[in-house]
């Protein structure tokens, strides 16, 4: 699933492609993707004639800001946006098509069909699900070391499980939780409320630094991720532990181990991240 760096990269590339374009019509081919309004026909009707003013991001969600509404889109496992001309062949996995007045069209492709789209009035998107319960952005002034420490003190779950909870901080998924924990020298199964202040301060720093570096590298392509211009990310070349089971640790040489934490495959170094 795309995490913050991948979604931010998609946002940046997509904004350059479609900002200022006006929607002529919307073709919904897989209706279950549309979550709000309930009727896909109403979704299409409300978007017709709307111009894309900007594209924002909240956690792993893309926010399309139009004249009179905001579309909140989650890519889930395999969702991708691409700009095409209307005479280009149509892929069978394209499930929503936004046709623009200039003859181009934005196609939403999703092999797994897990993606979602919600339509709101401006401002309403922040007070309703799915955005309402999200925690702070990791690059925001709200996400401080003190905030993280107080949040983790309230749970006896593993620190990995706590960080994957989007109510703690948004944008982190399997890849970047594993990487941040490795950089901070914290075992993924460590109990969240047992971390010391020193550990939490370092973890806070490494979360921000890891995400910053990943955004600068265009995200990580470990399976099928590409941005809206068809380009892969490059941060996978800098990963310390994720996807490196049995390979030598880049710091100590010990083989990277893989276990399951909170139902998620988890990579770590048993020497650098002692329990």
Curated annotation (Swiss-Prot):
CDD domains from the entry? EcFpg-like_N
Instruction: List the catalysed reactions.
Output: Hydrolysis of DNA containing ring-opened 7-methylguanine residues, releasing 2,6-diamino-4-hydroxy-5-(N-methyl)formamidopyrimidine; 2'-deoxyribonucleotide-(2'-deoxyribose 5'-phosphate)-2'-deoxyribonucleotide-DNA = a 3'-end 2'-deoxyribonucleotide-(2,3-dehydro-2,3-deoxyribose 5'-phosphate)-DNA + a 5'-end 5'-phospho-2'-deoxyribonucleoside-DNA + H(+)
Zinc fingers classed as FPG-type: ranges: 240-274
Cross-referenced Pfam families, in alphabetical order? Answer: Fapy_DNA_glyco, H2TH, zf-FPG_IleRS
Catalytic-site annotation from UniProt: 2 (schiff-base intermediate with dna), 3 (proton donor), 60 (proton donor), 264 (proton donor)
User: Where are the coiled-coil regions?
Assistant: none
Provide the binding site for DNA: 93, 112
User: What does the subunit section of this Swiss-Prot or TrEMBL entry state?
Assistant: Monomer.
The record's section on HAMAP family has: Fapy_DNA_glycosyl
Tell me what this protein is called.
Formamidopyrimidine-DNA glycosylase
User: What gene is this protein translated from?
Assistant: mutM
């Amino acid at each position: 699933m795309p995490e913050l760096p991948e979604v931010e990269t998609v946002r940046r590339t997509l904004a350059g492609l479609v900002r200022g374009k006006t929607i002529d019509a919307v073709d919904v081919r897989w209706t279950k993707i549309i979550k709000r309004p309930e009727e896909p026909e109403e979704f299409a009707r409300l978007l017709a004639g709307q111009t894309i003013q900007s594209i924002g991001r909240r956690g792993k969600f893309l926010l399309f800001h139009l004249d009179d509404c905001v579309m909140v889109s989650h890519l889930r496992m395999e969702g991708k946006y691409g700009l095409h001309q209307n005479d280009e062949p149509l892929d069978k996995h394209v499930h929503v098509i936004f046709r623009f007045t200039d003859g181009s069209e934005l196609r939403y492709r999703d092999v797994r069909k897990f993606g979602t789209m919600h339509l709101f009035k401006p401002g309403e998107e922040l007070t309703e699900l799915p955005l309402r319960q999200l925690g702070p952005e990791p690059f925001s002034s709200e996400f401080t070391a003190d905030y993280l420490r107080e949040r983790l003190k309230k749970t006896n779950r593993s620190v990995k499980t706590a960080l994957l909870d989007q109510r703690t901080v948004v944008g982190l998924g399997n890849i970047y939780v594993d990487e941040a924990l490795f950089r901070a020298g914290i075992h993924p199964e460590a109990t969240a409320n047992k971390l010391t202040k020193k550990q939490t301060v370092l973890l806070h720093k490494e979360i921000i630094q890891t995400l910053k570096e990943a955004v600068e590298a265009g995200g990580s392509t470990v399976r099928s991720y590409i941005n809206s211009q068809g380009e892969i990310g490059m941060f996978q070349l800098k990963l310390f532990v994720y996807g490196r089971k049995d390979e030598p640790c880049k710091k100590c040489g010990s083989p990277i181990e893989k276990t399951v934490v909170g139902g998620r495959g988890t990579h770590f170094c048993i020497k650098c991240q002692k329990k």
